[in-house]
Amino acid sequence: MKILVTGFDPFGGDKINPAIEAVKRLPAEINGAEIIKLEIPTVFNKSAEVVKKAIEKEKPDYVLNVGQAGGRFGLTPERVAININDGRIPDNEGYQPLGEPIHEDGETAYFTQLPIKAEAKAIRDAGLPASVSNTAGTYVCNHIMYQVQYMRDKEFPNIKAGFIHIPFLPEQVVNRPNTPSMALGDIVKGLTAALSAIVERDGKGDIKAVEGANH
């Protein structure tokens, strides 16, 4: 089994992005699966082009995109990606779409194929906070999650794909009072647990567990 794991470069004025820093530190093999690591730009469309080339080259069984969600306390596997680009800030090439569809011929939304409840449980079992998230935002994180699902829908039907958000690093919140963060080593530990759960649940589907939200 082969899993392509991607992490974004820094954006929004930060000099570091925990996504790519954590991805780079993942082991080369987790629970018997080969881990392919890829840095992608925080840029609408270009990020998808980079991922598509890697899919064509590596032919992974799974794709897990990792992104920073500053303000969240734990690791949060994402349930759904929506067909909208709506940038709160410009991307790293200065592009700021304001309520535009990602693909005119794409579905309104795509659900992940990954066992997000099993991922969240595995992360918590590793001693770290985690919960299922029902929104990946409307920036490049949601964009790449949606784009990979669109690729799956149109070109790569055998791939299973999803996204997980991670918190800020402590050094990123020095001047962001009362903002949660997580040590890089713990983020790596959490991602490793999530990836192990993906491998363990291969062919079995997700677990039955309470992970819903009222709002």
Swiss-Prot record:
Catalytic machinery residues: 78, 141, 165
Keywords attached to this entry: Cytoplasm, Hydrolase, Protease, Thiol protease
Enzyme nomenclature, EC number: 3.4.19.3
Cellular component aspect of the GO annotation: cytosol
Top-rank taxon, per record: Bacteria
Coarse class of the protein's main subcellular location: cytoplasm
Catalysed reactions, as listed in the record: Release of an N-terminal pyroglutamyl group from a polypeptide, the second amino acid generally not being Pro
GO function terms (MF aspect): pyroglutamyl-peptidase activity
Gene Ontology terms describing biological process: proteolysis
Protein name: Pyrrolidone-carboxylate peptidase
Protein source organism: Lactobacillus johnsonii (strain CNCM I-12250 / La1 / NCC 533)
